[in-house]
Amino acid sequence: MAKKHSKRYQQLLEKIEKGKIYSIDEAVKKVKELKSAKFDETVELALRLGVDPRHADQMVRGSVVLPHGTGKTVRVAVFAKGAKADEAKECGADIVGAEDLVEQIQNGNIDFDIAIATPDMMGLVGKIGRILGPKGLMPNPKTGTVTMDVCQAVKNAKAGQVNFRVDKKGNIHAGIGKASFSEEALKENLETFVAQINKLKPAAAKGRYIQHAALSLTMSPAVELNTQELMDIKG
């Protein structure tokens, strides 16, 4: 059965030229015109990559700090003890703990957006891997969230670090800002994000790397992006 869209959504759809492939500049301008919600909508980038994530050598995963942030207030939890716990608090972590934090999470109290851990804490954090993993909250060295430099990791998270991971079908979704951002800020965030994706292209990936790309707002239809323009972005 075909999905029925609201009248508002249909009106937004009429603003998008059917079948058109948009340049980055055009797409950013267009999505800002599609703002219709009462809240400050997130600008969302969706990519489909030519990779098979079932093979370990084709997994695309990492993180990037967006130059203009995400526009989102991020709550950061840090698993650390002693001097590293003190360092995390001084650098702005919202929650710092060890066994007590693990217990909170086991009891269903997850009040954070990003989790960071010192390497020595990963044995403990592993106990709640089944809880954090599906939510995309498990600390990982590839995203810079398992580190001794907890201060920098907290600062990156607060500054707008976006962690990403390709799903089983080769898709990556990321919020790259808010509808209230300037066109220039959104463009720079998008290009910074895509440059990192290009940098992480697996050697084993065959054929076209970015197969499909679209930009949208939380409550809007998507506009299709020129994938060649994206693949030409270098970091």
Curated annotation (Swiss-Prot):
Top-level taxon of origin: Bacteria
Function: Binds directly to 23S rRNA. The L1 stalk is quite mobile in the ribosome, and is involved in E site tRNA release.
Quaternary structure and partners: Part of the 50S ribosomal subunit.
Protein name in the entry: Large ribosomal subunit protein uL1
GO molecular function: rRNA binding; structural constituent of ribosome; tRNA binding
Matches recorded under SUPFAM superfamilies: Ribosomal protein L1
CC per GO annotation: cytosolic large ribosomal subunit
UniProtKB keywords: Repressor, Ribonucleoprotein, Ribosomal protein, RNA-binding, rRNA-binding, Translation regulation, tRNA-binding
InterPro entries attached to this UniProt entry: Ribosom_uL1_bac-type, Ribosomal_uL1, Ribosomal_uL1-like, Ribosomal_uL1/biogenesis, Ribosomal_uL1_3-a/b-sand, Ribosomal_uL1_CS
One GO term of the biological process aspect: regulation of translation
Family, similarity comment: Belongs to the universal ribosomal protein uL1 family.
